[in-house]
């Protein structure tokens, strides 16, 4: 028979663990909401556009919103480099980065200013590759993506030695769709702590 004191201790530990996990999640959610409202753009070495879906060689509305915002930053002459990211999805014939590059060029960004990162299959891989593309003394970047993405992007960018500023697009269709916005925000509130603790376990 298991002693009652052992059972009681087990329940207390389980309750404490659940409370700690809930506290971490709540703090993460608050930080996701805070970060999505921040726009810390300033002069940098590169503007980095995080990839999103492309449809048969055309940028999806989400990807287009990100590129359009990055072009606004480019036109403000905040950075000399314009980096587009994103690999090839299952069944795709081209990469998100290639589509983003063509679209940016069609809007006036010169090809000579654009760098493409087309190997990454995740946010983490893309940012790691971007860090490798930039010389050690040129790590200041402005990260462009959807608002809910900003906290985790900052965490991951720092892991790879980048010095990130964030500037979220305000025109993404995800932000205008309550159910989609809720879904992605909740997902980021779980992903951000994983990225944070993984960073500091290195």
Stretch-by-stretch model annotation:
Residues 29-186:
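A structural signal for short, hydrophobic/glycine-enriched beta-strand patches
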Residues 1-45:
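N-terminal membrane-anchoring alpha-helices
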Residues 26, 177-202:
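A transmembrane-helix-recognition feature enriched in membrane-embedded lipid enzymes
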């Amino acid at each position: 028979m298991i002693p009652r004191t052992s059972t009681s201790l087990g329940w207390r530990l389980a309750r404490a663990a659940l409370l700690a996990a809930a506290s971490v999640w709540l703090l993460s959610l608050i930080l996701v909401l805070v970060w999505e409202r921040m726009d810390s753009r300033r002069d940098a070495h590169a503007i980095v556009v995080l990839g999103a879906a492309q449809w048969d060689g055309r940028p999806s509305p989400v990807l287009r919103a990100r590129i359009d915002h990055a072009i606004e930053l480019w036109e403000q002459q905040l950075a000399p480099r314009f980096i587009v990211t994103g690999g090839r999805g299952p069944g795709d014939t081209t990469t998100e980065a290639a589509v983003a590059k063509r679209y940016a060029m069609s809007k006036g960004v010169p090809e000579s200013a654009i760098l493409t990162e087309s190997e990454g299959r995740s946010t983490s891989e893309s940012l790691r590759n971007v860090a490798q593309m930039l010389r050690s003394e040129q790590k200041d970047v402005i990260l462009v993506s959807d608002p809910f993405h900003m906290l985790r992007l900052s965490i991951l960018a720092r892991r790879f030695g980048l010095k990130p500023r964030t500037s979220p697009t305000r025109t993404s269709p995800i932000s205008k769709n309550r159910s989609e916005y809720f879904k992605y925000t909740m997902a980021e509130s779980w992903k951000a702590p994983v990225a944070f603790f993984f960073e500091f376990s290195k």
